[in-house]
A protein has these predicted regions:
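Structural signature of tandem-repeat unit edges
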Residues: 1-61, 69-83, 93-108, 118-133, ...
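Surface-exposed repetitive/solenoidal architectures
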Residues: 66-68, 90, 279, 302
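Ankyrin repeat A-helix N-terminal signature
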Residues: 297-302, 327-333
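Ankyrin repeat structural motif
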Residues: 304-311, 334-341
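Eukaryotic adaptor/scaffold assembly regions
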Residues: 320, 324-326, 333-338
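Long, compositionally biased eukaryotic scaffolding/regulatory segments
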Residues: 341, 352-356
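Terminal, non-catalytic domain-edge segments
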Residues: 346-350
Length: 356
């Protein structure tokens, strides 16, 4: 007949059913679930119950650790549900599907809510249209590789999907704020608005370089596609987000995204990709200015494919091509030499039918 703390709940062994006497002043039971006395709060669900779980209608809150170590594979929320307390679905290693219902508007509350931490079988989720906010660390440390959002979502808080497996995401036009490190590791972001949500640079970039990861992130908007360096110093990412939020700065800032890369190679490769996919005079001028450095980089790496791709941009002068040919000869880069010879036959020095 005493109050049960969160720590006590987290340490409970698997139970197939929970029952209490009616005289208990704090709790009640229904369908084997431990509830608050008024039946509005789900305190503990029997973790030994497997398969599909339908949380009883009328429940408004699920407390911390309510489903810890649950054997459930699918969980369906009632439309009455409004609050998910931190860590309520921790370590649900068999959980594969969550249906959030039509009632809840905020997924996770408070600092570091970590709702689904280490749910290693949860690969895909859909956030329903009525949800406005996804809380801090809500899906931190999950196996999620695909998430679907709907219009109506306005905020995604810090670390919401950190340490997940998501590589591509589409963000609704209604999204106004996206917290830091909420989507690190992205390869591609599709925006349904030409205005980037505030915080996007801190949300998707990192200040720690990882091997075998692309240098840049593709951001597709309705009117244009841009490329942002994957690796940006944190202070520079904050500055970038501030500038992207100011309408009079935004267009020019997007043309200069490559310049925020934390290392010269990152800047150069992001600029090259930008010139290939969405050229503009700003990036063209920049690449001409640093072309000697770029050529030296590819020579040092013995990267003939990369160097030829750079030459194909058509921004090098005839003299620069001659100098590159000589350096390629010195380094034994025969494929580059052959390409330059073919390219120089074109009077414009840009278009060539030569293929590798």
């Amino acid at each position: 007949k005493s109050y049960i703390t969160d720590e006590q709940l987290s340490g409970w062994s698997p139970f197939p059913i929970l029952e209490l006497t009616e005289e208990n002043p704090y709790y009640s039971t229904k369908d084997g679930c431990l509830l608050s006395k008024d039946g509005l709060v789900l305190v503990k669900y029997p973790s030994a119950i497997s398969g599909t779980v339908h949380i009883p209608d009328g429940i408004e809150t699920i407390t911390s650790y309510a489903f810890i170590l649950s054997e459930a594979e699918e969980i369906y929320f009632p439309d009455s549900l409004r609050v998910l307390m931190p860590k309520c679905f921790w370590l649900c290693n068999k959980l594969q599907k969550v249906d959030f219902g039509h009632g809840i508007e905020e997924i996770g509350i408070g600092h570091d809510c970590s709702l689904f931490m280490q749910c290693s079988m949860l690969h895909e989720i859909e956030i329903p249209p009525q949800v406005r906010i996804i809380g801090e660390s809500a899906f931190l440390g999950t196996a999620i590789s695909k998430v679907t959002f709907h219009e109506g979502l306005t905020q995604i808080m810090d670390y919401a999907f950190k340490q997940s497996c998501i590589k591509e995401v589409t963000l609704p036009a209604s999204l106004k704020y996206i917290g830091r490190q909420s989507f690190p590791g992205m390869d591609s972001v599709t925006l349904l608005s030409d205005n980037m949500p505030y915080g996007i640079a801190e949300a998707i970039t990192s200040n720690t370089i990882q091997d075998n990861s692309p240098i840049y992130i593709k951001i597709k908007k309705p009117a244009a596609t841009v490329f942002m360096p994957r690796y940006i110093v944190t202070a520079d990412a904050v500055t970038l987000d501030t500038r992207l939020a100011i309408p009079s700065f935004r267009e020019k800032c997007e043309e200069l995204l490559y310049d925020y890369g934390m290392q010269p190679e990152i800047k150069w490769k992001t600029a090259i990709k930008t010139m290939k996919e969405c050229p503009n005079d700003t990036v063209k001028t920049y690449l001409r200015r640093v072309s000697k450095n770029i050529i030296a980089m590819y020579m040092e790496l013995n990267d003939e494919t990369g160097l030829i791709d750079f030459i194909k941009l058509g921004i090098m002068t005839p003299k620069a091509l001659d100098d590159t040919y000589k350096k390629a000869k010195e380094n034994g880069l025969t494929t580059v030499m052959a390409y330059i010879c073919e390219a120089q036959k074109d009077t414009k020095g840009s278009n060539s039918s030569f293929s590798l």
